[in-house]
Swiss-Prot record:
The protein's annotated pathway: Capsule biogenesis; capsule polysaccharide biosynthesis; Glycan biosynthesis; glycogen biosynthesis
Gene: glgC
Main function: Involved in the biosynthesis of ADP-glucose, a building block, required in the biosynthesis of maltose-1-phosphate (M1P) and in the elongation reactions to produce linear alpha-1,4-glucans. Catalyzes the reaction between ATP and alpha-D-glucose 1-phosphate (G1P) to produce pyrophosphate and ADP-Glc.
Pfam families: Hexapep_GlmU, NTP_transferase
Record keyword Transit peptide present: no
Binding site for alpha-D-glucose 1-phosphate: 99, 164, 179-180, 197
Name of the protein: Glucose-1-phosphate adenylyltransferase
Reactions listed under catalytic activity: alpha-D-glucose 1-phosphate + ATP + H(+) = ADP-alpha-D-glucose + diphosphate
Species annotation: Mycobacteroides abscessus (strain ATCC 19977 / DSM 44196 / CCUG 20993 / CIP 104536 / JCM 13569 / NCTC 13031 / TMC 1543 / L948)
Keyword Nucleotide-binding: yes
Entry's Gene Ontology molecular function annotations: ATP binding; glucose-1-phosphate adenylyltransferase activity
Length: 404
């Protein structure tokens, strides 16, 4: 049996997330709450920890306080065996400037790699919702002999322009990689589908250091992992693709096998929440064999009183539903729904309060939003456009701490 290779995890968590505004007005995109008990970064960290990759640096930059605090409070490892998950804010090690791209973030953090001296480096994004066993991808990478392995997934061709598109041969060697093309290529067996990058990479350490340094010396580069680093290695014939569909996660159901969602827009973020609420959810939060770990608050259980009810919904700890109706919704912790209120098809983040007789439909309410007595959100869309952000799909998004 082969000894476990020495692996360093680097999580790219500096994203601003402009398309998720107002949810990112006060926090980095990976810190946005999700699913009633988590933040977006919890999915990648859970996948790495479940696979026993226990040396992880999280590179942060944009409005990172809540993200840094969340990692420090909820992701403490023992440290006795050299295990750690540590947030690393931008250090300006190469002069008085911030990260100019994801590749530059690694270039400015090469000291972390030199300190750890790993054989392989797992470079994953921090803002997707999915389960994955990265050890299986590492095995594929080692077997392939490539400098980099890119995790790939099939998506409808109409959606592929938002991603890096991959063309590979039968062995998995990448022949072409185009970042966010206007006219994405279809796959050989399905012209209506495209094979795209998930933003997750595994590098052999020396190869990563060499290509990062070469990119840093290129004045014409945008210093982006998908736009610059991967195409360099593809051009040299040293990049392989790992098919995410072959990844077998313990406890996965037939419905959520190979589930992966980019939640970079309000509509995608909303839709991913709606994947959680059915009797047989598209994405199952209750897989104990591959748990997603999140907030570790000590809260009382959720409570339903005076005939309050919740149907096809996820309700977080500490929440109270009193003589109110909740349907097809996700309620985070410490949410209060008062008498006669109706919440339908909505996402309520921690500390939200919905007053007596109020109605909330097809909406995302950020932390500590208060909906006043008899108020309505998501009922009169034109009125909502005057007050709040409304997505292309008609989802009403109300920013943190707003009183309505």
């Amino acid at each position: 049996m082969r000894a476990s290779p020495h692996v360093l995890g680097i999580v790219l968590a500096g994203g601003e997330g402009k398309r998720l505004y107002p949810l990112t007005a006060d926090r980095a995109k990976p810190a946005v709450p999700f699913g009633g008990a988590y933040r977006l970064i919890d999915f990648v960290l859970s996948n790495l920890v479940n696979a026993r990759f226990l040396r992880i640096c999280v590179l942060t930059q944009y409005k990172s306080h809540s993200l840094d605090r969340h990692i420090s409070q909820n992701w403490r490892l023992s440290g006795l065996a050299g295990e750690y998950i540590t947030p690393v804010p931008a250090q300006q090690r190469l002069g008085p400037r911030w990260y100019t791209g994801s590749a530059d973030a690694i270039h400015q953090s090469l000291n972390l790699i030199f300190d750890e001296d790993p054989e392989y480096i797992v470079v994953f994004g921090a803002d997707h919702v999915y389960r994955m066993d990265p050890e299986q991808m590492l095995d594929f990478h080692i077997e392939s002999g490539a400098a980099v392995t890119v995790a790939g997934i099939r998506v409808p061709r109409t959606e592929a322009s938002a991603f890096g598109c991959i063309d590979a041969d039968d062995t998995g060697r990448i022949r072409e990689f185009v970042e966010k093309p206007a006219n994405p290529p279809g796959t050989p067996d399905d012209p209506d589908a495209a094979f795209v990058s998930m933003g997750n990479y595994i590098f052999t350490t020396k190869e990563l250091i060499d290509v990062i340094r070469a990119d840093a010396d290129d004045d014409h580069s945008d210093h982006d992992m998908g736009g610059d680093i991967i195409p360099r290695l593809v051009a040299d014939g040293r990049a392989a693709v790992y098919d995410f569909n072959t990844n077998l996660v313990p406890g996965a159901t037939e419905r959520d096998h190979a589930y992966w969602r980019d939640v970079g827009t309000l509509d995608a973020f909303y839709d991913a929440h709606m994947d959680l609420v059915s009797v047989h959810p598209v994405f199952n939060l209750y897989n104990r064999r591959w748990p997603i770990r999140g907030e570790s608050e000590n809260l009382a259980p959720a409570k339903f009183v005076n005939g309050g009810s919740a149907q096809e919904s996820v309700v977080g700890a500490g929440s109270i539903v009193s003589a109110a109706s909740v349907r097809n919704s996700v309620l985070s912790s410490n949410v209060v729904i008062d008498d006669g209120a109706v919440v339908e098809g909505s996402v309520l983040m921690p500390g939200v309060r919905v007053g007596r007789g109020a109605v909330v439909r097809h909406a995302i309410l950020d932390k500590n939003v208060v909906v006043g007595v008899g108020e309505q959100v998501g009922v009169d869309i034109e009125r909502d456009r005057e007050r709040f952000n409304v997505s292309a799909g008609g989802v009403v998004a109300v920013g943190k701490g707003v009183w309505i």
